[in-house]
């Protein structure tokens, strides 16, 4: 289970429902809040193994999507929106996908992709792995509730993308520039990626949900995605308990 509010993944026992462990970034600090006994930073079930930079996600914009890749046995966590690296949520359009071993919690791969929709279409909703095509199907949405809204289903192919896990960004971008999110604009990112031979995730928009017959555009938060054995996509909408 991924945590949309922070960069965290929790593994539960399917039969008992008990927490086995949770996976969080290195240097995660829970001391600012007084937790009840058994909560907070409990070493027995906390694996602080993910890259520290993920602590710099925007508030409430953590791992919104999580998908299991049945081909390599890894979990792929998708940051919902561009991170606030350096404390600045600015105009970055760079987002990240982090692959991790669900048992050890160790990160295995990381991939970058830039937003391809309008500026307000900046929220990953959910993702699912398609083993027939070796790619991920991903919801990327805005907050609109009309037929003109953008709630795309994207196909994301990671096969040719550069693995940036552990990448020395300062060597490419300069002293103190430790992440591409710190660059001024998308053009600067594209230039830097070209210089560093960094290939982003290949993205193709398959469809836009509000344009489909029978889809009520007032359901503005598609945040669940599943793939049936026959290839049918099932989309779930979150209404935040609205009635």
Located regions from the model:
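Sequence/structural signature of beta-propeller domains
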Residues: 1-243
């Amino acid at each position: 289970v991924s945590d949309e509010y922070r960069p965290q993944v929790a593994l539960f026992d399917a039969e008992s429902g008990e927490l086995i462990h949770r996976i969080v970034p290195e240097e995660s600090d829970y001391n600012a809040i007084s937790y009840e006994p058994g909560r907070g930073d409990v070493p027995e079930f906390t694996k602080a193994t993910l890259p520290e930079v993920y602590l710099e996600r925007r508030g409430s914009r953590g791992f919104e999507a999580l998908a299991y890749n049945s081909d390599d046995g890894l979990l792929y966590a998708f940051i919902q929106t561009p991170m606030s690296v350096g404390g600045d949520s600015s105009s970055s359009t760079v987002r990240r996908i982090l692959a991790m071993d669900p048992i050890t919690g160790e990160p295995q791969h990381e991939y970058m992709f830039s937003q391809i929709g309008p500026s307000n279409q900046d929220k990953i909703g959910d993702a699912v792995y398609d083993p027939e095509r070796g790619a991920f199907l991903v919801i990327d949405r805005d907050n609109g509730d009309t037929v003109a809204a953008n709630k795309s289903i994207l196909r994301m192919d990671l096969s040719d993308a550069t693995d940036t896990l552990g990448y020395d960004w300062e060597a490419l971008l300069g002293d103190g520039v430790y992440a591409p999110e710190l660059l001024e604009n998308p053009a600067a990112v594209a230039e830097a990626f070209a210089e560093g031979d960094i290939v982003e995730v290949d993205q193709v928009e398959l469809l836009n949900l509000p344009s489909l017959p029978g889809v009520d555009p007032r359901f503005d938060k598609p945040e669940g995605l599943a793939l049936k054995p026959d290839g049918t996509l099932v989309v779930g909408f979150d209404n935040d308990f609205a009635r």
